Design a protein with these regions (language model features):
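Accessory interdomain/linker segments of ATP-dependent helicases and helicase-like nucleic-acid enzymes
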Residues: 1-49, 425-427, 431, 437, ...
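Beta-strand cores of modular interaction/reader domains in eukaryotic scaffold and signaling proteins
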Residues: 34-36, 42-44, 62-64, 72-74, ...
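Conserved P-loop NTPase motor core of helicases/translocases
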Residues: 84, 135, 179, 187-279, ...
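Pre-Walker A (Motif I) flank of P-loop NTPase domains
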Residues: 156-162, 187-188
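Phosphate-binding Walker
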Residues: 160-163, 169-176, 202
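Walker A/P-loop NTP-binding motif
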Residues: 171-185, 206-208, 298
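Conserved helicase motor core of SF1/SF2 NTP-dependent helicases
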Residues: 184-188, 196-198, 262-264, 270, ...
Length: 564
């Protein structure tokens, strides 16, 4: 609350019109907002304490940009009458929730129940996935890992699972090679999906690097799409079409369709227009089963499966799907479901199929083991603790650099906040992070790149805002543009240097920090794994050692750092 509108640009001349409300914060006490760009919000006038969403006109939208003094909001519905948002009024912004995901999951369950028996049996592990063994000689002669993976994906007749640990190139190389392999068949139709829009941007980046160029259409919104790929958005691709027949032909003739799972789920008519030979789904371990069922069980106008086979790419040792229920609430106790590997509703389809495949030593899965991101010393803990030492450095220049003059891994102890202070902020860590950021900037002044050099991870939005405030006080403009965010937002990205602020002030917070799973008796902290594997060259950690040492994995990490 406490935002005053200073400019209304609310046009009503069509869907493409700007629908942005700009506002500036009043000069009140310092606040730490827990909003970020792209968040779904509701906006309403709030000039009295009694004003709220139940007695004021509510507008829905998304945050287009957010600065220290200004918020830009893109309204979902164009307003033709500017007087509904008077410039002299005060406004409140609250987080909004979307029921689209829940609706699509219910629809997905219905589509599954009405799917062909053969597809239902496959997804319920009532029949094993089939594999074309005629390609075995080519697979055995593969010149590199990515060619082998692509050929195995081609040979799989039902599904193929690819485990891609951090830095192994599962999107930039493996997915790209699969697309090239499938696209070589002149008639092949390919559907490419991921969970987040940022990951879809990465898929588009991989597609754009293919030579000769491939034609693709992206399903999604402009706000959620990187500017470089907005020309491929379906609304732009179809803007020149004047007749439905032209729309039909454009979609039919484009052999690659790209989008998030949510975007494609919201366009079921796509499967009545096109039949896909393969669907390749990245970030599959972050997607719950009901979110995928509607797509994998879709049927075309002829009643046949709209998708012949699918490839799931992910890493069950990195972050899973985000759900509100705890493990006990989502546990499965039905014997028939347990018999097919469905043990918990929080698990992804990828995890269940992977467990079933490994139990039968089946060939419909593979794992990438050569990583080109982290220096071996940076990767040491995660490689030993979570991957059994199987990750091998590719040997890129930054991976073979000497560590004689550079600190690869360091811990900076902080102190907890005083009782009565919010548990979700730590001023000493914010100052440590800002000081480290300034030193890193000085070390890289000539080649500092805010999108590549430095990133900062911390678990709470309040701590994010505090760190940004401390960094802004340094007066270094380039540092104001670096990414400071939660570990969930960092999955899939990398930086030369990562700073991780644990922000633990009380023992009970340790449970929130972890996301535990177990494989072959080994305890794996998926959040810690992601945080430690974002850095290419250096990893710096700050936290309260007395509290962190209460967690066995964190204690082992601190012990390893001491040995450097």
């Amino acid at each position: 609350t406490g935002d005053k509108a200073i400019g209304n640009d609310i046009l009503g001349n069509g869907a493409s019109a700007s629908k942005t409300v700009r506002s500036e914060a009043l000069e009140t006490e310092t606040s730490l907002p827990n909003f970020r760009q792209g968040d779904a919000i509701i906006l309403y006038e709030r000039n009295r304490d009694t004003d709220n969403v139940t007695n004021k006109m509510v507008f829905k939208g998304n945050i287009e940009y957010l600065t220290e003094n200004e918020i830009g909001i893109r309204l979902r519905a164009t307003q033709q009458n500017p007087s509904v948002l008077p410039a002299e009024s005060l406004y409140a912004i609250e987080h909004d929730t979307m029921d689209t995901t829940f609706r699509s999951m219910y629809q997905g369950l219905y589509i599954y129940l009405s799917a062909r028996k053969e597809r239902r049996d496959l997804l319920l592990s009532q029949r094993p996935p089939r594999f074309d063994e005629s390609l075995d000689p080519m697979i055995s002669r593969s010149e590199d890992d990515f060619t082998r993976i692509a050929l195995k994906a081609k040979a799989a007749q039902d599904y193929f699972l690819l485990i891609g640990p951090p830095g192994t190139g599962k999107t930039s190389c493996a997915l790209k090679k699969m697309v090239e392999t499938f696209h070589a068949d002149k008639d092949a139709q390919i559907l490419l999906l991921s969970y987040t829009n940022r990951a879809v941007d990465e898929i588009c980046k991989s597609l754009a690097s293919i030579a000769p160029a491939v034609d693709f259409i992206r399903v999604g919104s402009e706000l959620s799409c990187d500017e470089a790929y907005r020309g491929h958005l379906i609304e732009n691709e179809l803007s020149s079409c004047n007749r439905r027949s032209e729309v039909y032909e454009r979609i039919r003739n484009c052999r690659i369709i790209v989008g998030t799972v949510a975007a494609i789920s919201g366009k079921p008519e796509l499967f009545r227009l096109k039949h896909f030979d393969v669907a390749i789904i990245d970030e599959a371990t972050q997607i719950l089963e009901p979110q995928l069922l509607g797509i994998l069980c879709a049927r075309g106008e002829d009643g046949k499966d709209a998708i012949d086979k699918f490839v799931l790419i992910g890493d069950h040792k990195q972050l899973p799907a985000v759900v509100q229920q705890n493990t006990e609430q989502s546990a499965i106790y039905d014997e028939s479901l347990l018999s097919i590997g469905l043990t918990n509703l929080k698990d992804s389809l990828f995890e269940r199929l992977y467990r079933n495949c490994t139990a039968t030593v089946h060939r419909s899965y593979d794992m990438l083991c050569r990583q080109g991101r982290m220096h071996p010393e940076v990767a040491l803990f995660a490689n030993r603790a979570f991957y059994g030492g199987r990750l091998i450095p590719v040997g890129l220049p930054h991976q073979i650099e000497s560590s004689d003059t550079i600190c690869r891994l360091a811990f900076y102890p902080s102190v907890p906040e005083k009782a009565g202070t919010s548990a979700k902020i730590n001023y000493s860590e914010a100052r440590i992070v800002a000081d480290l950021a300034a030193r890193i900037y000085e070390d890289h002044r000539t080649d500092f790149d805010e999108s590549r050099t430095l990133g900062i991870i911390t678990p709470y939005r309040s701590q994010i805002a505090l760190i940004k405030k401390e960094i802004e006080s340094l007066g270094i403009p380039a540092l104001n543009r670096i990414l400071v965010d939660t570990v969930e937002r960092f999955q899939g990205s990398e930086r030369d240097v990562i700073i991780y602020s644990f922000c633990v002030n009380y023992p009970y917070q340790l449970k929130f920090l972890s996301n535990l799973t177990e494989e072959e008796g080994v305890l794996i902290d998926r959040k810690l794994n992601v945080a430690l594997t974002r850095a290419r060259k250096q990893m710096f950690i700050t936290g309260v050692p007395e509290l962190l040492e209460r967690n066995p994995l964190y204690k082992s990490l601190l012990k390893l750092i001491e040995s450097f």
